[in-house]
């Protein structure tokens, strides 16, 4: 170590981590003990951040992708002066504490992302770096480099084994994200044992092939060597950098260092005592921080951070004078607000016009893109099918970062995680598209978006067996039920173009949850009532889209998406036979469940017990709405390859079958 205060600070990070994990009787000490020098060097010598304001917009972003090493992050947050107290450290992994087992965004000040599912932190960091480049290209002007921060991540071997890290690293290299720097805690150990049991690839050649700069630090305790590598990484703005730092997991533990035993379990009282002796730590008290360490962090983090933000605020004030309209637009974007009156840009569709909801979604995207400049997104190599292209929006590429169309390539998981990073970064309203059946490929990222409360928008097209000829591999069955089961995710399957416009409006208005828009490939008719009723109806999750003509329905037809049009046609056929039913459009179960019982009973009158649910997906869940006297027309087997109309007929999604099933319910 160059200076004793630096050695003391690093040892303090290590001992705080050891003590918190011992007290919790649970946790992962090995990574914080091994990676403390690189994290300390980054936080005190390179990162621009202000603990007094964790939300300073131009701060450097830091993602601990190896989220199991959370005590490394919590120790740094505490020492740096973030609102994480010593009592918080003592409550590590306990009910209601600020220091959960893995870092959680929105839960702990200074935590930039929820991590723990390995690989996703790297991909979220890629998304943050993408957001920084786009916003810099959009808003920076001569003399005003308002947005120019770096994005840093610390990852481990496990992160690099995950497929999402490969997808994201490939994308980052392609996009030449030079302000992205990943420190790789390379300790040759995984949870199960030595790394050579499962991982022997040449990481350097792999990342160089992706288009990254690769640097290596041989001694993970040598902070001068680490600092030199970080300087070199920051100097190359033409490509992202991976810095492999060779470390010893559980550094200093005389019996456990360098073994898998120190990865995911407390050291134990005796080993903890011996480790502190090995560190020449002379303080008997647990959770002890020498006053000079606090002073050191004040001098290296808090004071410089406050000055840097103050200087940035001065620059922003001058920018507001020089570019008032641009500055107002940026301020609004940072605050997550939409332009006044933007919803007037939403198209309204006349009854009778047939249009696939993926196509109306594409029209909505292009209409709102003109009114909402922070709209930014793309597709996983399906833009022409998902209809996600912003016409005239330009391409987000190394020579045109101001472009609004992102070409994610066939990297669904990286797309999902990068969208999370963009949403975490702020300043953008982001969306990503793929086929609904491939939502499985990005599901873990959707789950993290829901867990973090991020308003990401998913454009999921080709939503049923109506896909047809491509067959069962491309026909979603269980996917609606699966996504509906996820907490804090709004799933909307609109019936027509007006419901689609309403769904987009609700998705953009969301501030605390992601939205999945589930859209058809095939044309569907625009229904008579939706121009007037769609927004409030979709907002409430379900509504009577076509009431029984006599005002006294004998039965209810409940449907979503393209099946609503089918239900309306069946309603007409039943009426011709003197049977009166109401049609309920139920685009969003989660929104409907959030309504008061009085509204739910208004839409689904308890007295009308004969109910038929119609949906081209799994039946699971519909029983709560149809009740004991109802019936469900759904699909609980895989699809088939044939023209869509033929498959729908074979699976019973015809007017004749709906009429027959309804009459059977009524005993007619």
Curated annotation (Swiss-Prot):
E.C. code: 2.2.1.1
This protein's UniProt keywords: Magnesium, Metal-binding, Thiamine pyrophosphate, Transferase
Biotech applications: The thermostability, stereoselectivity and wide substrate specificity of this enzyme offers good opportunities for applications in biocatalysis for ketose and chiral threo-diols synthesis.
Classification via NCBIfam families: tktlase_bact (TIGR00232)
Entry GO MF terms: metal ion binding; transketolase activity
Disulfide bonds: none
Binding site for substrate: 28, 263, 358, 385, 462, 470, 474, 521
Organism phylogeny: Bacteria, Bacillati, Bacillota, Bacilli, Bacillales
PANTHER family in alphabetical order: TRANSKETOLASE, TRANSKETOLASE 1-RELATED
pH effect on activity, per entry: Optimum pH is 7-8.
Protein family according to the UniProt entry: Belongs to the transketolase family.
Keyword Metal-binding recorded: yes
Cofactor(s) named in the record: Mg(2+); thiamine diphosphate
Function: Catalyzes the transfer of a two-carbon ketol group from a ketose donor to an aldose acceptor, likely via a covalent intermediate with the cofactor thiamine pyrophosphate. Can use L-erythrulose as donor and D-ribose-5-phosphate as acceptor substrates, forming glycolaldehyde and D-sedoheptulose-7-phosphate. For synthetic purposes, is able to use hydroxypyruvate (HPA) as donor substrate, making the reaction irreversible due to the release of carbon dioxide, and various aldehydes as acceptor substrates, which leads to the corresponding ketoses.
Protein name listed in UniProt: Transketolase
Entry-linked InterPro entries: THDP-binding (IPR029061), Transketo_C/PFOR_II (IPR009014), Transketolase-like_C_2 (IPR055152), Transketolase-like_Pyr-bd (IPR005475), Transketolase_bac-like (IPR005478), Transketolase_BS (IPR020826), Transketolase_CS (IPR049557), Transketolase_fam (IPR033247)
Organism: Geobacillus stearothermophilus
Binding site for Mg(2+): 157, 187, 189
Cellular component, GO, one term: cytosol
SMART domains: Transket_pyr
Catalytically driven reaction(s): D-sedoheptulose 7-phosphate + D-glyceraldehyde 3-phosphate = aldehydo-D-ribose 5-phosphate + D-xylulose 5-phosphate
Record text on cofactor binding: Binds 1 Mg(2+) ion per subunit. Binds 1 thiamine pyrophosphate per subunit.
